[in-house]
Every structure is written in C-alpha cells, then in structure tokens.
Amino acid sequence: MRPIQNAGGEETIRARSYPVAKATAITAGQVVQLSGGKVVPAAAAQTAAILGIAGEDHSGTADILNPRADGDEILVCDNPGLIFECPVPTIRAASGSAATLVPASGNIAAGAADDAYNAAVLVLKSKAAGSSNSDKPGTRRAVTDYAKSGTVLTLETGGTPAAGDEYEFYPALGSAVCALNPKATALVVSATGAAAVRCIGHDYERHTIRCIAAAHTLAAKS
C-alpha cells in the first residue's frame, strides 16, 4: 500500500514511532495493527481496527547498515483519514455471455455473499489468444448483480468474455468485501474478510484502487 494523501485533501503524510518487537518482520507499505501494545502486520481477513501503513522496513534481523531493522520502534503513517492505494486485482474469465462473466476457479471468493460485488467495475485488460470478445482492451463494464451460486457476475451488456480473457476488478466504491494479500500490501478479490479496509477510489489510468480505514485505532469513538 502506498499512502497518497489524507481525506481532507492535504498531501503531507504524517508518520509516528510505535513500539515493535525486535524480531517482528514488517515491510514499508504493509497494513499494520496494534497487538499487545506493539505493531504487527494486519491479517488477511482484518476485521479489527488498523493502525495505518508501515512507513519503513523492519526486517526483524540485525543489519549493520540499518540499526532500526531490528529496533524496538517503527514508523507508521497513522492518520485515521489516510488514503492509500494498491494495484488493482485481476481475474480471468472461465466463460461468459453478452451480459455475464464466470471467473476462473479461485479468482473470486467462493464464500462471498450474493450481491457482494454489485457496483464493481471490470476493465478488460487483455484477451486470450483466439478470443472472440468484441470488447476492446480498456472497455469498462459495471457489475449489476452477483450470484454466489456459480460465482456469476452480471454485467452491463457488451462483448462475450472468452476463457482466459483478463479483467481488472475494481471493487464497488464504499465496499469492504475484499481481503488483504498474504503480505498485507494490497487487496485481493480471491478472498473476503478485510472489513477494516474500504475501497473509496478507482484510478483507471494508473490501474490502482484507493482505500481508507473502515476501522482505525485512533478514530474517535462515540
């Protein structure tokens, strides 16, 4: 994840030091949380509040060139209104029609509920060899319905997806239905559960999605 600005519009990114166990491995750009009063990586299915985005590497092993690599503090970009971005996840089609797409096995979370991906946007990235899909790369198609049974995405009418056609998958704005990847550095649609991270922006030119904390350790609570 790359911090880009704060929700108020200011681009100055604040980072503060927090305690971390000397042996804990964290990379810059990783989503982190507090556990036992110390910074640890966020879980793939992060539902508890996050602290922010790690602002530096902390390998957890001694490094003569970087005394902080196994130090007892780490910098975290911790503004509750921090907006951060990651590469957009991609899926491949297994089959489809002029108004539907069935993703390849494992590309979409099998446990995602009906309508979980409604209002998402698919952008054709590339076509498989021999594909008869009439859409051109870059074509955007909104998801109008999602059915868990068969993992069927209903789309705005367009070309027929062929097996192997690759699409960028932009989650619906305001949704928190994805999961974090194993390194907690990006969102994936192959799993669900990271309810603490919400998608709030699509950058089709840079092929990224923008996110914000849906639950933050420093956010005011009523």
Across the structure, where does each feature detected by a protein language model lie?
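Surface-exposed, low-hydrophobicity beta-strand/loop segments enriched in small/polar/acidic residues
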Residues: 1-222
